[in-house]
Design a protein with these regions (language model features):
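Basic, amphipathic alpha-helical hairpins
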Residues: 46-59, 101-110, 130
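Basic/polar phosphate-binding segments, predominantly the helix-turn-helix DNA-binding elements
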Residues: 26-35, 58-91, 115-137
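A solvent-exposed interaction/effector surface
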Residues: 89, 97, 104-105, 112, ...
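N-terminal positioning helix adjacent to the helix-turn-helix/winged-helix DNA-binding module
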Residues: 39-47, 83, 92-95, 107
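Conserved hydrophobic/aromatic pocket- or pore-lining residues that grip, position, or stack substrates
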Residues: 51, 75, 293
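Compositionally biased, intrinsically disordered low-complexity segments enriched
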Residues: 15, 21-29
């Protein structure tokens, strides 16, 4: 049985690399199937959250299967069907992409400390895994130019892709001088409680539909704060992660999150300091402006990037304005330079 077949309804989309519906089914059979599919998603979502929070330590298949209340065999099969990767592949990719980001943004950091931070128990094991994945050693990657590092981190995807490229084309990004008039401010945002749907940056249309879906979901349940405008959270940096794997949350801030299950999750964002700018356009435009921030504004600012989710606040209603046509107040997490992790 392919569990994703349950999720192909017409009303709206949700993605963990899939389109699925949150509408009522037209028959008792379909309603039962939908309930089962939501329960599966709830279990797998719980495992994904656990993996993200425990990325710095070893996790066995038995441990993850227990969290999902499946046998190891059934858990591995269902996880791959929903996520598109086995648990081992998913964990390895998250760890290595996190390591690549850490090395790229903080090249002075000790490679061994990076290995430990992303869950590897020795430098030898980490170096071998990094080279197997990126075809280059961590130390050589660190010494590479920025453009070469971007090429390297996208290689696992471009080598496998036979059709449309799922990665961001960094070669075509605008020159940094095009952003000389970009206004960058430092702000501290208060903590936020929100509910969200998870999609990816592979398709702007999927993102647009996900904004509509989370708005509809919260409105139907009349959640406190559900009249607020949805906003976005980028969980993975598109330069380092293929767009079809780059997790994007469409969120609604709520005063008191109700009990949630299935395709909708709860997300708490703590109070943080951000470097903020406003840019019009799609994900490539946002990344172009972020590159300017990193290379032109960050040096000498006394701050450095924190590798945590980026918040996108739309200036126009994202349920009525396509992603690429909106203007986004972009919040990139920062901390005082040299602060210990």
């Amino acid at each position: 049985m392919r569990w994703s077949n349950f999720f192909l309804k017409k009303s709206c989309y949700f993605s963990i690399n899939r389109h699925i519906s949150i509408t009522d089914s037209d028959s008792d059979h379909n309603a039962n199937a939908m309930r089962q599919s939501k329960e599966l998603l709830e279990r797998i979502n719980k495992v994904v959250r656990h993996i993200e929070q425990a990325i710095d330590r070893e996790m066995s298949l038995d441990e993850l299967a227990t969290i999902a209340c499946f046998s190891p065999f059934h858990f591995q099969r269902i996880f791959k069907e929903i996520i598109g990767e086995t648990p081992k592949q998913f964990i390895k990719r998250l760890r290595l992409e996190e390591a690549a980001r850490l090395i790229a943004f903080h090249p002075d950091r000790n490679i061994l400390s990076v290995a430990f931070q992303v869950g590897f128990q020795s430098l030898e094991v980490f170096s071998r895994a990094f080279k197997d994945y990126y075809s280059i050693s961590p130390d050589t990657y660190r010494k590479s130019s920025e453009s070469e590092r971007f090429r390297i981190t996208q290689m696992p995807y471009t080598q496998l892709q036979t059709g449309e490229k799922p990665v961001l084309d960094v070669v075509s990004l605008k020159p940094m001088q095009d952003f000389d008039d970009l206004s960058i401010e430092i702000v501290t945002r208060p903590p936020i409680q929100c509910v969200y749907l998870k999609t990816t940056l592979q398709s702007p249309k999927m993102v647009d539909e996900s904004f509509k879906s989370i708005k509809q979901w919260s409105h139907i349940r009349d959640l406190p704060g559900s009249d607020a405008t949805p906003f976005g959270v980028i969980k993975d940096y598109p330069i380092f992660t293929a767009l079809d794997k780059c997790r994007f949350f469409t969120c609604i801030a709520v005063d008191n999150p109700a009990k949630i299950s299935g395709i909708v999750n709860h997300f708490a964002i703590s109070s943080k300091k951000y470097a903020t700018f406003t840019i019009e356009g799609g994900i490539a435009d946002i990344v172009e402006a972020a590159k300017f921030l990193v290379h032109a504004w960050m040096p000498g600012s006394g701050y450095e990037i924190v590798l945590e989710p980026v918040i996108l606040i739309p200036l126009k209603d994202p349920t009525a304005t396509p992603f690429k046509e909106n203007s986004w107040q972009t919040h990139i997490p920062i901390q005082p330079e040299g602060r210990l992790y």
